[in-house]
C-alpha cells in the first residue's frame, strides 16, 4: 500500500479472513485494528526567528512510506522529507511543533536519523538540528522537545509525555 504523495498519515489495519455468505443474510464480524505507524514529534521550546519561512524535516533509517499489510511493516526503506510552510510572526508568543508519521521495517527500531532545517524566504539555512539513533516503535509516539532555533553546543535530553501511548523514548534537549 502506497500513501498519496508518499506522505504517511496515522492509520490502522487488520489482516484476517472475513466470512462471506450468499443471500441476504446479514453477517456480523468483529475486526480489531492495529496502528501501523510510528509517530515522531519535534517541539520547539524557543521562538523561531522572524525570518523563518519553511522547515524541512528528513527521516531516514529503517523506515519508509510503503506499507506491506501481510507483514505489518514497511515494505522498503526510503528517506522521507516533509516541508512545512511557516508564518514566523504567528509563533512569536508560542512555540511550534511538527508531527510526522512513518512506517518501520520492524516493531522497534533505534537507527532512525532525523534532520530539521529552518530556512528563510530566500531558502538560506537559518538553523539545522540533527538527531541520530532516534528510537521509534510502531503504534507509539516519540517526542523530542527543546530549543530548536537557539540550542547550545551541549544538549541534554529528558522524557516528555505524548498524547498517543508513549514509546518511552521521548527526549528533551
In which residue ranges do the predicted regions lie?
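Structural motif
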Residues: 43-51
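Beta-strand secondary-structure signal
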Residues: 28-30, 39-43, 56, 113-115, ...
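Broad, structure-driven detector of short, well-ordered beta-strand segments within folded domains
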Residues: 142-150
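Intrinsic-disorder/low-complexity, polar/charged segments enriched in Ser/Thr/Lys/Arg/Asp/Glu/Gln
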Residues: 26-28, 39, 97-99, 141
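Tryptophan-paired
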Residues: 51-140, 169-173
Amino acid at each position: 500500500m502506497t500513501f498519496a504523495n508518499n506522505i504517511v498519515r496515522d492509520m490502522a489495519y487488520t489482516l484476517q479472513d472475513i466470512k462471506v455468505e450468499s443471500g441476504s443474510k446479514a453477517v456480523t464480524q468483529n475486526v480489531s485494528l492495529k496502528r501501523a505507524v510510528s509517530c515522531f514529534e519535534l517541539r520547539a521550546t524557543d521562538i523561531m526567528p522572524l525570518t523563518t519561512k519553511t522547515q524541512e524535516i528528513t527521516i531516514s533509517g529503517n523506515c519508509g512510506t510503503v506499507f506491506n499489510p501481510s507483514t505489518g511493516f514497511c515494505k522498503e526503506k526510503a528517506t522521507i522529507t516533509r516541508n512545512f510552510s511557516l508564518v514566523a510572526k504567528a509563533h512569536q508568543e508560542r512555540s511550534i511543533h511538527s508531527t510526522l508519521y512513518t512506517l518501520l521495517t520492524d516493531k522497534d527500531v533505534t537507527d532512525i536519523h532525523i534532520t530539521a532545517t529552518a530556512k528563510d524566504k530566500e531558502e538560506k539555512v537559518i538553523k539545522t538540528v540533527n538527531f541520530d539513533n532516534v528510537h521509534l516503535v510502531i503504534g507509539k509516539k516519540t517526542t523530542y522537545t527543546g530549543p530548536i532555533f537557539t540550542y547550545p553546543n551541549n544538549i541534554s535530553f529528558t522524557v516528555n509525555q505524548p498524547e498517543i501511548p508513549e514509546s518511552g523514548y521521548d527526549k528533551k534537549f
